[in-house]
């Protein structure tokens, strides 16, 4: 599954997510089409069994987050990452 996460708290979301799940995550600067506020789009690929726990974690960090879930047909490359510590 692929998550597209729209948040104003990218650093906090990424830190919480990476420290617990050790998956890669990408961050892109964005501007809200309605609010015109600066925000961020985060993209990551997860296993379906992780979905509920990850959504809960992200919502704890940012109560205003928007999370769009896509079914991923195929995924190639490293899935689990070694800790950066």
Q: What is each PLM-predicted segment?
A:
Residues 1-85:
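Positively charged, small/polar-rich N-terminal and surface patches that mediate targeting and assembly
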């Amino acid at each position: 599954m692929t998550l597209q996460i729209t948040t104003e708290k990218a650093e906090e979301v990424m830190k919480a997510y990476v420290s617990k799940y050790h998956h890669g995550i990408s961050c892109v600067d964005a501007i809200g089409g309605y609010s015109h506020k600066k925000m961020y789009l985060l993209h990551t690929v997860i296993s379906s069994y992780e979905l509920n726990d990850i959504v809960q974690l992200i919502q704890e960090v940012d109560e205003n987050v928007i999370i769009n879930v896509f079914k991923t047909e195929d995924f190639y490359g490293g899935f689990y990452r070694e800790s950066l510590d």
